[in-house]
């Protein structure tokens, strides 16, 4: 594009900006006519037009490119001719404003009357493009926004409103006058952003003059004005573009999500309909005058069988007895619906739910389980209708407060239904939600690439132009010089632009006044000058001034002094010292806590003074040493000085109230660590990089939040005020409401955090369901799912390799390493010296120096390298060469001496100038290569970590003996020594044998030989597969045994005894296994394998507890806690299961980087934690009335002392919130709760209510403390938690690179072929079900196998689902009957389908899985009809099976071309399944271990908050349920709360637990906190994020696959069509049927008729009998789609081999000819025929004429016989024309039967079908076709014709 547009450029420079005149317009019209004529000509001659595009750098809105120079003032704001060649024949003109921005207008009259030359339009244009105009509009919008945030605006705001409307109207009028309304391009309504303005203004006028009822709803439309900011700020448009793109891309995911949710909701509806209304109702009713026998009859209500029957309480016949009961004035309905009769738990708003199955919740004494009252949460949580079920499942999928739904459902329906939730969380939540992330990330990446490509293009264009201009300039110079020589005068060039020796422009000369120059030269030099200046940040005078003021070189002694100080300040040791000070300072700040002694407080404040002094001194010294000019050139120094200044200011203002926040700024010093901690540095960089891009996104997010907050306030604010009594018992506004803007903003922010359901219930209760659902779900989908995922996408994209390169700006980066290197060197020096002394020889200093090498990278005299050397950046390109060299060296490809960089690598610590790159996802090597990723593939330090090899080796695990390979031996050696690989290794390492020679055993004789035989026997046993299987079985059994040790074990004596014995048996077996392995493998191998170490430690635990039992110490505390470590037993299973081991190895590879990020996150959080301690320590205490659990008002109790004075009553307590900020540790816990959004509400409420230390809190007195949490959530939660995902994904990619992705060495082209072929090879033609011989059966068969039949059945299935969706819990009898009848119809239809298929397909019906499934469903449906009551009572409702039928939709999707996107998503899921299964297994293992641990530690804690009778750690099942809940971090705060009770009055340590001898119900806070935090980090952050990583990865792969021209389905469709043409699955097809076959195929393989010629050109090989093989056809068609390529043949060969191997039954496949040869043969034959015919004709004509002449001469003598002869001959020649076709077809048949490869010579005429190819007989013979055996070039068609 660039090159094409260059020649058409007018030589740039300001002079080419020509005013737009009527002549210009006429010229445009002239050009347009010429262009039209040219196009017409081209069209007639069928010449293709290259597509023309507008130039990207001259788009409207962009700035005028530099090449055009500075436009002179007279062209500013004036219509100019368009510069873009694209518009040369279109009626447009441009206008430039002062900022050189381009505005493009249409040159047609605006509003039909204002031509481009009219005064009015010119004025309007001037106003429109003026910077002040847009500024004014922007300010108006912002002011308007401020007015919109007022919850109750003053009376005069109406007038202001009119003003705003006036301004917007004026703006639109200006635009219309300048641009025109909507007819041509560049008019007002052609810009979608103007639609927004137009609609807003129209709405304003409509609402003003027409009364439309609900004004506030319409007024909310004004909020959209805030969107106008997007039009004014340039960067925002692109982000919004990306957003809109991603929303478009999301359509498929949305459809899939809605579909899956509908299916799940349907299942939920069928399973749990009406369950959530089951409550505990007081029973029997407390009445005196009722007939006692009526309710006291035991058999009637107390009987389990009765109350286990669901149908009883809904039974109409029973209710019909009301009339009888009402005699005794008992109103059943009222009783059942009176909330006073329900059982409520303390502090809950909803009655306790219960269920009638054995594993559901039970009611307390005196209550019965009945269906009564409304559903929980104002009646909004239920499965009673499809829509509520859908909402419940959407909530489950977005994981908002789902633990509540989970607990309610399990309580009402039973714990078995946990499976339902597992499926939905894993499929719905993890998969679908992350697909949304994957799609958004991809859309963003694509958008990004496009932008980059555009920039690249511009850059290239610009470079080309500069080249041209330079040449031009040189030519001018030459011309001038020549002139000067000729004329003898001076060539007086332009003085300001003399070039200095470096070839750069010297801009120091004074500029004259700008003269309007017409030479291109000045434009170029101006442009160049601008470029130069653009590279300098400040104007030149600033540099002069800075040199004078900021560089202090006054006198020689001072300079010397400066140099000394520089040496001191820059010394690595000083750096080390400063770093230590930073760490100590951070520690001091982290030691603050509450309550703190005065002495400790003093120590801390003195410490702070000292550190402030040290840092100030460092800054002052650096300023002296480096001069302010140099000092402030470095970012770190600016940062330092900022913090030091703040610290000093804070000291000065220490006693001013309210400025304690300044103390928090000291915390930023922590970030100075980044200087010497590469990972931290890099993470800060990543965040910095993202913040740039995120700046715009954050603005968009802010605009969205603002709009929704205002909308919420306008729509619902009033309702909250008026209907507040519905949601608050004391009729005061709750904390979360929308009455004012700030609270409305908080609600929207909370929705962005993913918590929308609770606030939505409130909203629905006060303001109606429809509006609230709409607004909340819009915020949820737009804000949370799209914008926040875009956030994540940005972060992930910042993880690109560029940001991972650690910064090399300053040499100081390594100062720490240098210092540490020196210290190591010093220690080594001392060691060597002392050893020398001990050995009695005193080494000279020189010797020691020689033996140790240089001290840690210092120069000769131990000083650090001089400053200038240090700062010099490494040469960029040179580096690259060195890098390549380095790689070659590693692989051994370069000979000659080692490259210097290699030596550097070896002399690693000693090189001070080396920047060490520590990528975030570092490889596992301890030493990083000095080069970046290029060397990763050849990572050298592998051998350094040999001993631990098995851990990282995917297959070898000694302890999983199945694949034991003795390590550390060369494969060749090994092969020589023991051919079977079945000999044990050495027992001990060489070092051991050297130290203790007694360990050496001679195995060739005597005892040694016996020992060797024993070892070999053990080795054989251990290596045997059965042994391995047995051990795995034992591990599983012993792990399973642990699950029985719950709180009931004491009561189950038999089980307990069995377990005790089993435990001993297991221990003995494992000890035996360990001893066997010691003997078999030897200590050396056993103890160098990490998996064996794991086994060893776990067996040790068992041994210790066994010994303790023998000695009778089993009740000792330490022994008991050791016993809990038995929970680790299942870990031994890890090494035995391949799938899990793969995942664990991947995880272990990621651990270093995960730890790195975890550390950095901790540092990040430390800042917020210390800040929290500063803000809230000791302020969360409150005074509470223990009887009512209510907090006293501050009017009653104001502070701690007042509270303590009331304590004598015993009902008052001064207590703290359990999770608080009293010290940094608790601060961390609080932050974790806030970051996972669990339990964060209580912490936030406490913070917002807090006043001062030891003062009673007051409601929302400290409202803006919410902002602390908002900021933390953005930086601490969004950023840092998402970094985990980034790291894990990055790591996955690194590991893939390391373990050799095979695709790395393939070109894109090759990959395409490779993939197509991969798919191709896996398929082969199936034998179709034969068509029945019977006529009727045959007809039915045809009907049943049609696609239409399938699709119509599918539609019926969907309709059946719809009728199931219509069901509700409280439907009328009529509806029940109608649905029953409809259901009957469906059952009959599906039964009919079943019968028809069985009739047509006969016994083959049962060979297809889907058919069997259908059959079972039909049978179940019929049985279900007959026995519905019975089945519903004891089994799952049979309607459920119908839901599974929906899976058949997947089959129909193939037939719909448009559903490709959805199929891609499903394909991604299928690809991820194996990996996800492995991760699921690992997750289960972790859950298992933790639940065993939880049972042994928390079984007896007090039941409160999240722990109750169903959700607890008492039994294994309950523990698993609790842990599954926490896997998504849901509800962990509730489970942790009771465990934080450490003593009275929170819990009772002496409480008796019946049935056991364990006392107390207190928890252990430290164990509890470790337990939950570690579980959350492992499961939530690591395992769940691995899920995300895999899905992202596979989604990308699947998208690539689906975007390939040929996908799996195309091949499947090919074979499906093939089956119809080859019913016997011979894999061959007749050549005659080929044309029909390729015509019936689906796109893209299809070749539509007429396709004869096309098929001939495909050159397909044929076997005897004129048959063609399926693979050949498929290859040819694939080639046709993908285009030809050199790799094709090789691939084809491998594919054929594969196919032969897969199908040994294949017929001997020896092609004898090809379609092309066959055609050539036919053509040859026809030509020979024709030639021969002509020859005959000519002969007979000759003969005839001869005869004629002869007869003339002979006077007719003998004519008759000759006539006969002649007639005969003529007939022979021409008679055949009549039976042309007959002969031809016969000839063809004969030819078909011949198997001769040579050309046929029988004489037949051409067939009609070939006439197209053969010229009519009279024409001269065509050039002969090539002889046999010679190939024809690709253009066969031409040669044939």
Swiss-Prot record:
Where in the sequence does UniProt note compositional bias of the Pro residues kind?
Answer: 1814-1826
Q: Which segments does the topology annotation call Cytoplasmic?
A: 1-131, 179-192, 234-252, 439-572, 623-636, 677-692, 792-1026, 1077-1090, 1137-1153, 1286-1348, 1397-1408, 1457-1475, 1592-1841
Where on this protein are sugars attached? 214, 288, 291, 297, 303, 315, 327, 356, 1185, 1199
Q: Which gene encodes it?
A: Scn4a
Assembly, in brief, is: The Nav1.4 voltage-gated sodium channel consists of an ion-conducting alpha subunit SCN4A which is functional on its own and a regulatory beta subunit SCN1B. SCN1B strongly enhances the presence of SCN4A at the cell surface. SCN1B is also required for rapid channel inactivation and recovery after inactivation. It prevents the decrease of channel activity in response to repetitive, high-frequency depolarizations.
Q: What is the name of the protein in this document?
A: Sodium channel protein type 4 subunit alpha
Q: What keywords sit in the KW lines?
A: Cell membrane, Disulfide bond, Glycoprotein, Ion channel, Ion transport, Membrane, Phosphoprotein, Repeat, Sodium, Sodium channel, Sodium transport, Transmembrane, Transmembrane helix, Transport, Voltage-gated channel
State where composition is biased (Acidic residues). 925-941, 969-983
Q: Give the recorded effect for residue 1586 to V.
A: A very low percentage of homozygous mice are present at 30 days after birth, suggesting high perinatal lethality
Region annotated Disordered, chain positions: 32-63, 484-522, 854-896, 925-983, 1776-1841
Q: Which reaction does it catalyse?
A: Na(+)(in) = Na(+)(out)
Report the sequence similarity comment from the record: Belongs to the sodium channel (TC 1.A.1.10) family. Nav1.4/SCN4A subfamily.
**Any intramembrane ranges?**
386-410, 741-761, 1225-1246, 1516-1538
